[in-house]
């Protein structure tokens, strides 16, 4: 199994599945997701495009030596039996309206096997529990099911990927404390302009030996230095739901960081 590298690219990029930036052509996104040029870790989630992101990444991986890249997957939103709940997306598989705890392991195995089939692969290097609800954080049955997937060889390691930035800290810390002997990784929102609440969980992760992947490291594109208050975000772009004025405020903070970073304003 290949551990995640220090840099990664995910199938949510390219504006096709999560409306982050301008939607690019599938062929261009496939080329971007093709491992190589120093980025050999690729991530996907089965809920993106209801499996379409898996399929696109699968095309990008055709012919690539399996030992030459790290593959990270994520499952948790049930688009097989659940109905989309507007902007909240599909319900978690732990929704009591969908199944009982004794069915969690079966769902997880089914979801992972179907995701791997779409990807054209036989295993993940890391499998994440995607945007868990309270049950996902606290249920023994959930983490027994996740550990069983590792035991079965469908993934080399397992972890958790909390959802929106607000409100996950205490749930995540408790999850580490209860199931840290089983959890290998956590993927959290963390960057210099958005330290809260991600950094509040770092000590708990360290105590349990849980390794951390950070996401949204560019603060919605601010650190690329090409997002300005005049930037027109595409319709439905999820960055448009951030608080009003976040771009101007982020740019002002970025300017204060320039002397330390040794870079000049690009605009």
Regions found by a protein language model. Name each.
Residues 13-26, 93-109, 130-136, 165:
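Active-site mouth loops of central-metabolism enzymes
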Residues 25-28, 131-267:
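Beta/alpha (TIM)-barrel catalytic core signal, keyed to glycine-rich beta->alpha loops juxtaposed to Asp/Glu
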Residues 9, 42, 57, 71, ...:
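Conserved, mostly hydrophobic/aromatic
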Residues 39, 121-124, 155, 183:
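A structural motif
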Residues 1-73, 77-81:
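N-terminal binding-site loop/beta-alpha segment at the start of enzyme catalytic domains
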Residues 22-36, 101-119, 165-176:
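Short, acidic/polar
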Residues 22-23, 82-91, 226-233:
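Short, flexible, mixed-charge acidic loops at enzyme active sites
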Residues 114-138:
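Active-site groove signature of glycoside hydrolases
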């Amino acid at each position: 199994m290949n551990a995640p590298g220090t840099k990664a690219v995910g199938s949510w990029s390219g504006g096709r599945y999560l409306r982050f930036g301008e939607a690019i052509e599938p062929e261009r996104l496939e080329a971007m997701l093709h491992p190589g040029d120093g980025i050999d870790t690729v991530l996907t989630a089965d809920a993106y495009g209801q499996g379409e992101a898996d399929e696109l990444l699968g095309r990008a991986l055709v012919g690539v030596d399996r030992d030459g890249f790290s593959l990270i997957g994520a499952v948790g939103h049930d688009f097989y039996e659940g109905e989309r709940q507007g902007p909240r997306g599909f319900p978690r598989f732990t929704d009591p309206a969908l199944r009982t705890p004794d069915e969690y392991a079966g769902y997880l195995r089914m979801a992972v096997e179907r995701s791997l089939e779409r990807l054209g692969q036989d295993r993940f290097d890391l499998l994440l529990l995607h945007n868990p609800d309270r049950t996902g954080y606290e249920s023994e049955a959930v983490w027994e099911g996740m550990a069983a997937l590792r035991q079965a060889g469908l993934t080399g390691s397992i972890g958790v990927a909390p959802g929106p930035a607000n409100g996950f800290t205490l749930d995540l810390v408790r999850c580490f404390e209860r199931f840290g002997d089983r959890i290998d990784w956590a993927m959290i929102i963390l960057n210099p302009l958005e330290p809260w609440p991600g950094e509040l969980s770092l000590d708990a992760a360290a105590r349990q030996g849980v390794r951390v992947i950070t996401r949204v490291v560019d603060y919605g594109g601010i650190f690329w230095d090409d997002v300005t208050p005049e930037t027109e975000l595409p319709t439905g772009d999820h960055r448009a739901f951030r608080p009003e004025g976040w771009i101007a405020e982020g740019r002002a903070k970025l300017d204060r960081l320039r002397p330390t970073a040794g870079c000049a304003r690009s605009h």
